[in-house]
Amino acid sequence: MRKLVAGKLHGIHVTEANLNYHGSITLDPDHCEAAGILPMEFVEIWNKNSGARISTYVILGERGSRCCILNGAAARTCQPDDPIIVCNSIYLDEAHITSLKPRIVTFDQDNHILDRLSYSVDIDTDGRYSFAILDEADEPLVIPALVSGA
């Protein structure tokens, strides 16, 4: 079994950091449903400003609020307006990787959904993997590559 990405809220902005709450991250149910994130599910959080990485669990806030609130100890790692990535995962046998279609949701500064993307992995007859990022119409997008200084 391998731990693989199941869904992501990419670039969602922190709306509040509440040190005195019990812990967790509070998210708009609309956003969670778009990415396939469940209430009480453990997620990884990566702060794009500070590089901080934490793990916590999801609680649902008010539907339509576009909230993203870091609670308890997690509030020390993120400040309001920080763009973060919230990622859930799944354990899956490698033989089933081509059936996994993680849902990726991107956001504007006010946490309105910009894009609904998915990831796709295929395997050829020689056992080599290929990877694609697909838009809502299942059309592949360009994948950024690290290019050395030419």
From Swiss-Prot:
How are cofactors bound according to the entry's free-text note? Binds 1 pyruvoyl group covalently per subunit.
Supply the EC number(s): 4.1.1.11
Q: Which InterPro entries match?
A: Asp_de-COase-like_dom_sf, Asp_decarbox
**Where does it primarily localize?**
cytoplasm
Q: In which pathway does it act?
A: Cofactor biosynthesis; (R)-pantothenate biosynthesis; beta-alanine from L-aspartate: step 1/1
Keywords in alphabetical order, please: Autocatalytic cleavage, Cytoplasm, Decarboxylase, Lyase, Pantothenate biosynthesis, Pyruvate, Schiff base, Zymogen
Q: What class of enzyme is it?
A: lyase
What is the designated name of this protein?
Aspartate 1-decarboxylase 1
From which organism does this entry originate?
Mesorhizobium japonicum (strain LMG 29417 / CECT 9101 / MAFF 303099) (Mesorhizobium loti (strain MAFF 303099))
